[in-house]
Amino acid sequence: MLNSPGTRRPVKEAQKYGEDSQKSHSPGTPGPRSSVTTLSASALSDSSSPDTPPRRGPGRPSTPARAPATSAPMMYSRRGVRRTARPAGADTRSSANQLPQPSGACANADSAPPADVSACLRRRSHGDRCVPRSRRRPRPRPRASTAFFQEEGPCGACPGALRPQAGASFRELRGLPPPRPREREQSPPLGAAPSSALSHQGWKNTRCATRGLVNTLVNTGHFLYLQPPAPLIMPYLDDAEVPGNRRSHPSLSFSWLSKALYHVTFLLRIL
């Protein structure tokens, strides 16, 4: 239907597909479309007169390798063995890859028979899109992961994360536990030592040796799922260390003293 003999295709499309009308017609007679689509105006006037033989026959004079822009867009290759019609701007070095193709081996109902085997394979893999046009390289096929790189992930920087509308988070798809709720950054109490300006988690890991040891054991992965989702607040003697009471007891914040007392009692309990 699309390529029926009555259908006229413009010259650009005829160049794009590199169609060969000699496979379905005798070598002396031009195909039904070839006089319309592939010949220039001068060649049309030659072939339309009754006494002049058509220029596409076997006795046609050889065309130079670089055809001028006014000549017919289709050319024969230099060797007389293969008479394959090719676009004028196509690369002549690729003719070594072309094999003689049996008619109808790869011809679809909606596309003209291809000029060579590699174009046939390209056309079968994804559409007519990659068949080389004249003077232009084929479009590169898109990468497989392009769909996931379009938007940033939930964290804003992960390139491979799924879109947030997808329903499942990126970590759940890989079997990871869901991320914990972030700790609130705790403001230091008014009279406190500068060490407590760190967040509770950072203080716990740096200042306390025993608790840091427990943390390293826990974070190696054995007890990963047994940790509570939010860190527990250690029962200091100082009320100002509890986040709810921070603002209400600014005068009681002897935090370094209370921490020292707590660790002394903690170590005594262990021993």
Swiss-Prot record:
It comes from the Eukaryota. Residues 10-23 have a biased composition (Basic and acidic residues). Residues 33-50, 59-73 have a biased composition (Low complexity). Residues 121-142 have a biased composition (Basic residues). Residues 92-101 have a biased composition (Polar residues). Residues 1-202 are annotated as: Disordered. This is Putative uncharacterized protein encoded by LINC00271. It comes from Homo sapiens.
